[in-house]
Amino acid sequence: MNKRRRRLLAGVGTAGLASIAGCSSLDFIRGEEALGFEADPARVTDSAVAESGYTESRTDSDTIVREFSAAGQSREVEVTNQLAEYDRGITVFGQRFRGALFVVLSTPQVDLFDRTFNPVGEMDTDELIEMIQERYDEIGDVTREAERQAELLGESREVVTYRAEGEFLPTSLPVSLVDLTVHISEAVAVGDDFVLCVGIHPREIDDTDAIDSLLAGVEHQG
């Protein structure tokens, strides 16, 4: 995943800001504590990665500073999301590329004044894919295609697939715009965070079984 694509996925969880551990409303008003929200990592187990045929390509954190207002006061809030990225190669036009991608995002909830300010928990998958499009203009022509139930964090969750067109392959190829299948899970509240997963691959391959194996293997480390 390139830097831009990482920022896209990291940005999914930061539109409304994440969860503070141990910060009271009085702390916020007086400004007596630095406001820092950091999600715990979420990862796919080694056995699930091996079963899927994917490999772990990187784990990363993404920190964003936003101004946050409450009780008539405004302060800067530092939000840290955790990303885990997995991929596997495909062969196109006789050349091998990283063609299938699976990303796990853990983003803080931002619980303050008995409210959760991170909107991800209230978004459905249509809203999540719209947010992805806003942050990643190489994906377009998105159409909702199907829904299914898949295991994620120990329970059956809704996963929606979308048909899209995007610049997923290197532009040096004769065809750089390809039809894509995008899998998006609902956001799941776990601990003080929300966890959601995104899988992307060309439509010419069916990676649904592999995506479901990865989903079932996700563990939150909080």
Report each predicted region and the residues it spans:
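Acidic, polar-rich N-terminal leader regions of halophilic archaeal proteins
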Residues: 2-222
